[in-house]
Amino acid sequence: MMKIIYAFLLIAVVAFMGSGIMAEPLAEAIAADKPGQAKEIGIFDRITELINWLVNH
């Protein structure tokens, strides 16, 4: 039950970050971590990463 609550909270945070307030600095930070593979981060990519993390833990 707690995993479900945490999942919804994390999705809310990811949605807030993806709304444009944090999207640009976050995209630049990830692009800096992966030279030559700069990509724009979409909200669905973040949700997919969250779901994969929840499944693996």
Curated annotation (Swiss-Prot):
Superkingdom: Eukaryota
Keyword field contains Cell wall biogenesis/degradation: no
GO cellular component: extracellular region
Prosequence residues removed at maturation: 24-31
GO MF annotations, alphabetized: toxin activity
N-terminal signal peptide: 1-23
Protein localization: Secreted
Keyword Secreted annotated: yes
Tissues expressing this chain: Expressed by the venom gland.
Alphabetic keyword roster: Neurotoxin, Secreted, Signal, Toxin
Role, per record: Probable neurotoxin.
Family from the record: Belongs to the formicidae venom clade 4 family.
Protein name (record): Myrmicitoxin(1)-Pm7a
